[in-house]
């Protein structure tokens, strides 16, 4: 399964509200993707601990959140389903070196354990997000439900750093990953799909219960479950999430369990 690892799947599932160890993720909980995917040089002493790889699906259906709103352009969603954005991961450069120990001592809702991971972990309630703040001045913001909320949260973190006496700026803000999810509301024959689309699929149910579908255009990774739950990740803009789902939906209907 080149290009996507089981630990990174854990992070994607948790950010989409999926469950690990059979328990749904807590609302607003966040997990960060591997830092190498974000092009951030953090030089951590060790990688953050990863949860063990036991998966189950959400305890509650997401069907209600996937219904079309009256103000949605139906011509762009012929399937009648609009994926819900679950997590936005963004990065920003604060443009100055940071004393992480000082930040952890004086900022609220901040933790720093350099023996585990070389970044301050900071949280704010509105928008409900988590930031990783590195000594280099690079920052990762995760947990927002929209691009605007991610930018707002990143600015709030930068302002907190400024108030602590650092000459923090707000440079090179960039959306690195958008995670969405939806429910097609019918079971899917994953074996048949994997066989017919073997050039794009990885399906190893003994390792991971979902089928991994790597779409070429747009370049999106989809996690497809037998229940009809879908997770989409790898987008830079939300339109890529929507386009990828509309591309895959007719394929999924071909492999609907009867």
Curated annotation (Swiss-Prot):
Gene Ontology MF, one: DNA binding
Protein origin, superkingdom: Eukaryota
UniProt keyword list: DNA-binding, Nucleus, Repeat, Transcription
InterPro entries, per the entry: TBP, TBP_CS, TBP_dom_sf, TBP_eukaryotic
Gene Ontology terms: biological process: DNA-templated transcription initiation
Ranges for region Disordered: 19-80
Protein location: Nucleus
Entries under Gene3D superfamilies matching the protein: TATA-Binding Protein (3.30.310.10)
SUPFAM superfamilies: TATA-box binding protein-like (SSF55945)
Pfam families assigned to the protein according to its UniProt record, in alphabetical order: TBP
Cellular component GO terms held in the UniProt record: nucleus
Stretches forming Sequence repeats: 85-161, 175-252
Transmembrane segments: none
Known function: General transcription factor that functions at the core of the DNA-binding multiprotein factor TFIID. Binding of TFIID to the TATA box is the initial transcriptional step of the pre-initiation complex (PIC), playing a role in the activation of eukaryotic genes transcribed by RNA polymerase II.
Subunit details: Belongs to the TFIID complex together with the TBP-associated factors (TAFs). Binds DNA as monomer.
UniProt family annotation: Belongs to the TBP family.
PANTHER family: TATA-BOX BINDING PROTEIN
Protein name: TATA-box-binding protein
Organism lineage string: Eukaryota, Amoebozoa, Discosea, Longamoebia, Centramoebida
């Amino acid at each position: 399964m080149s290009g996507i690892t089981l630990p990174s799947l854990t992070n994607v599932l948790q950010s989409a509200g999926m469950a690990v160890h059979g328990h749904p993720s807590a609302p607003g909980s966040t997990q960060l993707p591997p830092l190498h995917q974000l092009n951030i040089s953090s030089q951590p002493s060790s990688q953050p601990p990863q949860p063990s790889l036991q998966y189950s699906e959400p305890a509650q259906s997401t069907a209600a959140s996937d219904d079309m709103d009256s103000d949605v352009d139906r011509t762009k969603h012929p399937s009648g389903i609009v994926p819900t954005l679950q997590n936005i991961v963004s990065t920003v450069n604060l443009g100055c070196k940071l004393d992480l120990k000082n930040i952890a001592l004086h900022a609220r809702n901040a933790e720093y354990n350099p023996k585990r991971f070389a970044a301050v972990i900071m949280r704010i309630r509105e928008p409900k997000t988590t930031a990783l703040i590195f000594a280099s001045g690079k920052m990762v913001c995760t947990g927002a439900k929209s691009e605007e909320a991610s930018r707002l949260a990143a600015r709030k973190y930068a302002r907190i750093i400024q108030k602590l006496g650092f000459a923090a700026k707000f440079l090179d803000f960039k959306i690195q990953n958008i995670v969405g999810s939806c429910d097609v509301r019918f079971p899917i024959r994953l074996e048949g799909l994997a066989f017919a689309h073997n050039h794009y699929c990885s399906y190893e149910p003994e390792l991971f219960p979902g089928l991994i579908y790597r779409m070429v255009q747009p370049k999106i990774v989809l996690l497809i479950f037998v229940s009809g739950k879908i997770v989409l990740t790898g987008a830079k803009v939300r339109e890529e999430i929507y386009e990828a789902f509309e591309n895959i939906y007719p394929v999924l209907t071909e492999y609907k369990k009867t």
